[in-house]
Amino acid sequence: MTAIRGGSRRAPGLALALLGGVLLGACHGDENAQVNALPGFVSGSVRKTAYDGASDDLLTAGLGKTGLGSDTRPGFANPAQPSAAELRCLAIYSNYRALVDITPNGGYGRFWGPNVDLAGNDTLGEGKIAGTEYLAYSDDGSGRKNVTLLVQVPASFDPANPCIVTATASGSRGVYGAIAAAGEWGLKRGCAVAYNDKGGGNGAHEIGTGVVTLIDGTLATASSAGSSSLFTASESSSTLAAFNSAFPNRYAYKHAHSQQNPEQDWGRVTLQAVEFAYWALNEQFGPVVDGTRHGIRYRPGDITTIAASVSNGGGSALAAAEQDTRGWITAVVVGEPQINVRMTPGVTVEQGGAPVPSFGRPLADYATLANLLQPCAAAAVAATGAPYLSALPMGVTQSIRTQRCATLAAAGLVSGADTASQASDALAQLYAAGYLADSDLLQAPMWDSQAMPAIAVTYANAYTRSRVTDNLCNFSFATTNPVTGAVAAPAVSPMTNLFGAGNGVPPTNGINLVFNGASGGVDHRLATPDASFAGAFCLRQLWTANQLGIGTNVDAVRVAANLQHKPAIIVHGRSDALVPVNHASRAYVAQNSATEGRASQLSFYEVTNGQHFDAFLSVPGFDTRFVPVHYYDEQALNLMWNHLKSGAPLPPSQVIRTVPRGGVPGAAPALSTANLPPIVQSPGANAIAVNAGVIDVPL
């Protein structure tokens, strides 16, 4: 590893990592200087590492297609103190598998995977990709932002035909979070890939020990790491000690507890990732101007750059394109974007010619409502037969559903004299709030898997700029007894492999979401018979009563849907129950048509039987009913590439009517092209009409 010196801020942990490396001179400045200057937002030193494509590589960390597909995750020589390289390997393994279906019957190795080329053929063997990585922090000078930036430059990069693909992390994942969603396609295309962790990035602080993570996942104490930690809780050591005494075994997380509302910067940091990639490419391919330093070969706009990712990484790409004032981004391709749109009067979302009940709500609204109602709605007749996605016994889950319905009814929040009617009313309220009937069978697994509770709690903390010591709505993050769910000291600290195995949003990697009641903290599902209704209701009231500044902070993350006439594609699954299409993609497309009018170059592809988590597609009941949206994300990237490079027209907005695999849950037949109709130039009756602020999606 080579370290390129940037700024002067460097903590002991980083200093140790630099020992034995070669320090090359570089300076901060702007791209108009003769010498390639490190962007001013880069803090500390840049780590440069070359990978040979055999023992280690950019895409698979040396595991290859076979290793990524194996259920045996990579281990550590010393489990108590894994190396940075071992943590990187585990991070790539975990994040790749978290975003796609990794089963052969589900499409891995046939439609996607390291062995599959861009034409969809199995020609690449193990798919290892040689190249170079550049790793650094972006910061504002405070030492508290510390957004992780990473650029991968494959050995196949053609400096005469340069390209960049952004791969902003989805969820609150670490910097490798979108390696399967966008990084893989970019690397295979021979493009540099510009990653960033959005300033959420799986950073945690173990309150009881003071242990924090560094940029490479290795650990240090908060005091020794100083401003080089990925995240350190802002409270004083005495405040944290008092909190630990009252609430032991708790954890602070960066997205939830940084008090910075990081989402407001997601577009900006995605642009910074592109600028950092320009610097890296100039450093690698620019002319040598004084014997040691490189000049500038590429200036803003010189490199074909596609902003891409999924979920809130996709939302970040859209925000970046809107904020781009220097020509960094050429085009946008995103999947299932989590995006909060600033809707203007007159904009309308219709389906089958009729207005939908609700659209364009921000995540803070629909997530807190769903978290409150989903456990009850899961008991509705329309949700019968939903996939079961919980480690709890079915009897416990059924009891939770019954009790949540009863408590909601007692509070006057649902109507009905029995569980069935109460559940039906809860589901009807979700319909009225913009959820589609296509999502009926996903309401239960979105809550049972704890995806919705995790999002509701993390984002509520972020949008209220809460501290870990606030225990917002009596929720916190803690290790628990695996049998009782009560807060308990871990046998082994989850911090050791957090960088490699965590996803940044508890419950994750042994750190769980707990509700702090009179008897102490307990897994929120088990803390009360109604699964911590009081906490869920409190989260909902934050939004409905506009408490703790939540409205102001949500307004700060809204976007205008002005892509500045850049060509763009949005792909979204119609059945998505985590990021409902009415509130995200449909709303964005409608607002974009009002904002950009006929100058808009945005195409929208809505995938029937598509939902948010392709990694769930191997679960019984998911496999038979839902198809991989990732397949269409990659098709969209190919379409955009052909548009940019050969002028091929982008297919118009359309509904893609897929065919579920069917069969027996858990044993669905292999995915085939019969399940996955192509995106077409002439969609006919499947065309989505978009005009002057109105989108009408065929039934």
Swiss-Prot record:
Give the GO molecular function terms: hydroxybutyrate-dimer hydrolase activity
Q: Which SUPFAM superfamilies match?
A: alpha/beta-Hydrolases
Q: Which GO terms describe its biological process?
A: butyrate metabolic process
User: Where found, per UniProt?
Assistant: Secreted
Q: What is its main location?
A: secreted
Ribonucleoprotein keyword on record: no
Q: Which GO terms describe its cellular component?
A: extracellular space
The metabolic or biological pathway listed in the UniProt record of this protein is: Lipid metabolism; butanoate metabolism
What EC designation does it have?
A: 3.1.1.22
Q: Residues of the signal sequence?
A: 1-33
Q: Which keywords does this Swiss-Prot/TrEMBL entry list?
A: Hydrolase, Secreted, Signal
Q: Which InterPro entries match?
A: AB_hydrolase_fold, OHBut_olig_hydro_put
Give the reactions, separated by semicolons, that this protein catalyses: (3R)-hydroxybutanoate dimer + H2O = 2 (R)-3-hydroxybutanoate + H(+)
Answer whether the UniProt record assigns the keyword Signal to this protein. Answer: yes
What family does the database annotate? Belongs to the D-(-)-3-hydroxybutyrate oligomer hydrolase family.
Q: What HAMAP family does this protein's entry cite?
A: 3HBOH
Role, per record: Participates in the degradation of poly-3-hydroxybutyrate (PHB). It works downstream of poly(3-hydroxybutyrate) depolymerase, hydrolyzing D(-)-3-hydroxybutyrate oligomers of various length (3HB-oligomers) into 3HB-monomers.
Could you identify this protein by its name?
D-(-)-3-hydroxybutyrate oligomer hydrolase
Q: Which organism is it from?
A: Burkholderia mallei (strain SAVP1)
The upper taxonomy is: Bacteria, Pseudomonadati, Pseudomonadota, Betaproteobacteria, Burkholderiales
